[in-house]
Amino acid sequence: MKDIIIVGTSKAGFLHLKSYNKLSNVGKIFFTDIKENTSNKNIKNKKIYKSIIDTLSQNNLNSNNIIVDICTPKEEFYNIINQCISLDINNIIVEKPFIASKDFFYKYPNLNILMVQNYLYSNIISEIKKKIEENNFNIRLIYTNFSKNRINDSINRRGMSKKNTRNFEIEIPHQIYLAEDILGKSNKKEIVFKDQKDFIIDNIYIEKHGYGKIILEYDDKLVIHESDLVTNNTIKEITIVCDEGVVIKGQFILYDKDLNKIKNGKVIINKYQNIIFQKEFEEDDNMYYCLKEYYENLNNTGIQKKYRNRILEFSNIFGRIIE
């Protein structure tokens, strides 16, 4: 089984470690961070190496038997990927939002790289897709809202390096790939409207970080994504409007800052305001199922094309959004 080097010691790194620790068969897990320390109390007992090459040399690791899992701000993604390439490490997992072109994959045909899209593995999304297929619902509009109070994290610059992170780069990447997955292949993808508002708390100002909204057209369907990072309300839901008065709402499980569950997930289907289906979810460990599939695939000889296609599809629309 391949060993794992997690790059980055923030919340994302901890969540990935937590998922890997649930696997029945997994190699050794290491952490590297250029700061050589960790601000995350949950991984205080782990040795933090200052670089990937130090991790390899100090532990006599074989680069062919390594998966590098990148959990850093996005500005650092390609620097770390290039380090991996120079060290002949071909198996990489990278957090969102990762953008790549076809030319990049042509240049590195042996590079197995997967972007974390954990909500694709959500029980809530699986149930929604199942109901759409079973009932042949025709989608007219998708609205997603991933909002939360991120004020303390933003003040402490979590998920940021030297460059400020814009609102569109935090929750909205999840919302984009979810809508694309539900809609399937579209011939036309157009940006109708986009807006980001600044983060202003006391004397702290972060440009285009506080609030974001995007309106997109996928063929004849409208998609609206919204994310407010300075609200006191925690919202993580998707609403799908279909023909004949059908509205599907998926509400994801909500957690507090210490990852304690505060609300179960739910899928509700209404028809002209009458509930025709309802199901509650007490468990939805989508990060575990995402990383489990990735780890198992990267331990096999070949990686499926679907993972590259997912990155290219995401890059096609997200690259235009952040221009």
What is each PLM-predicted segment?
Residues N65-T72, Y288-E323:
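C-terminal helix-rich "cap/oligomerization" subdomain common to oxidoreductases
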Residues M1-I43:
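N-terminal Rossmann-like dinucleotide-binding module
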Residues N42-D54, N110-I113:
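Active-site regions of enzymes building and remodeling cell-envelope glycoconjugates
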Residues S122-V192, D202:
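Predominantly a Rossmann-like dinucleotide-binding segment in NAD(P)-dependent oxidoreductases
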Residues L15, N37-T38, F277-K292:
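Active-site loop of classical SDR/Rossmann-like NAD(P)-dependent oxidoreductases
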Residues I170-D256, K292-L298, F318-G319:
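Contiguous beta-strand/loop segments that form the cofactor/metal-binding neighborhood of enzyme cores
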Residues I67-P73, F77-S122:
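Beta-strand-loop-alpha-helix segment that lines the small-molecule cofactor/substrate pocket
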Residues I52-N64, Y106-K107:
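Short amphipathic alpha-helix with an adjacent loop that forms part of the alpha/beta core around
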